[in-house]
Amino acid sequence: LASAVCGLCLYASFAPLRWWFLAPVGVAVLVAALRGRRPRAAFGTGFLAGLAFFGLLVDWASESTGTWVARAGLGAVLALYTAAMALVWRELFESLGDRPLLLAPALATVWVAVEQLRGAWPLGGMPWGTLAFGQVDGPLLRLAPYGSSQAVGFAVVAAGVLLEAAVRVARRGGKASAIGASACCLAAAGLVFGPLFLPLPPVSAGTGTVAVGFVQGRIPAKSEVSGRLRALTVTENLAAATRRLEGRGADLVLWPESASDLDAHTDPDAGAVVEEASRRLGVPLLLGTQRYPGDYRYNDYIAWLPDRGPSGRYTKQHPVPFGEYMPARGFFRLFTSAVDQIYLDMRAGSGPALLDVNAGGRRLRVAVPICFEIGYEGIVNEAVRKGAQFIAVPTNNASFGHSAESRQQFDMTRFLSAETGRTAIQVSTVGVSGVAEPDGRVHHMTEPWRPEARLARVALRSGTTPATRVHGYAAAFYLAGAALGGLALAQGLNRPGGNGKRREKGGR
């Protein structure tokens, strides 16, 4: 039951609910559930908590594939990380005892390190469910430009550990216990609300502004049209919606990922639609297209200049396993035929995720992480360190139906805007699309599954936040801390009685 409550609380902190304050509560429940557990029970408790959390969070995986296997499989794999973390936590309980001021930073360090590992390995990792991405409506967002998702996640977990300690100490009764519980509550509140008093880092906004249009089209149902004609219809629908921006003074217009699944470089029909839209606007158009050089494909985001055609390209460097390419296809076909829905594997390009384009009488440098790449902070931070003035996040969410996937992704966009000190625009094939500001404000939001065209005045910023500068080093720090925790676990399990036979208070 405690595992389910933990998972529910963590899930509720993310979109669509965004009850950010439940994340520390979920952590507190997990801490309480793990106290006194033997190793095997701790692993099981952590796994069930992770399964409840991720199984709810990634419901869009079944929406995308049409089978429950994808959701269950992805949820179970991600839950293994929570299970492994629970084992390390359990050993830290044994080593550090009942000392919340030591346990809070220790457990938080391990949690963040496991998130870093999960976001990088295997197959490039999966950052979905990083605790910080559920805090965009809370006070901890102000911590993002100073310490990235790592510091925010650390604060959430440490606050949860202190909350559990406060409840446990208060139940003992007596004046000393009341004082101790109050101190733990105050410390937890300070971690969560203290960042409200932090100023925004002094990232320069002195390079002016630019008028950026972004367009959300309409994806026809497969029953309406299919194959090549369906891909061309998507591009035509975007071009039709783009006409709403004509004469409104846009300097640059963004289309989403997969705006042209036909190669706009080589397909004459797709290229003609894009060229006409760019020429009518009279400004550069950034759009997603695909290349098919052989029995594989690339996912590109390109600049298209009126009367000149393609000029500049970024190729997605982090294709999504099981979504854009199928690893070990033969093996996984033993479990489901859904693997063959991906009939042409996508290959990785290289970074940085940048496009340079002349617009509004100046040379612009735009960070362009494609779709899920917005969750990989290293990709975005690299682009900003190399001079990106704002962030465009082209994405195709059509496969995920009416699930919360696009809103969860937009929250990542919001977080990275705050982390990097850059205005960020998410532009989706079907929504949601919108603009996120570094101070947490959101504007020009679209309704999903409706053609939309919006025009936003975007500040062009230079300079970097502390988080952008140190993100990679901080990740190494947390991983080193977790490695020490892992050594403690190994030593603990090798001690006499370390297999769980030694007496433990409250053993179950």
PLM feature segments, named:
Residues N499-R508:
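Cytoplasmic C-terminal tails of single-pass
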Residues L22, V27, R40-A41, K175, ...:
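Residue-level detector of intrinsically disordered, flexible termini
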Residues L1-P199, G401-H402, T413-L416, S428-D439, ...:
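Membrane-embedded alpha-helical bundles of multi-pass enzymes
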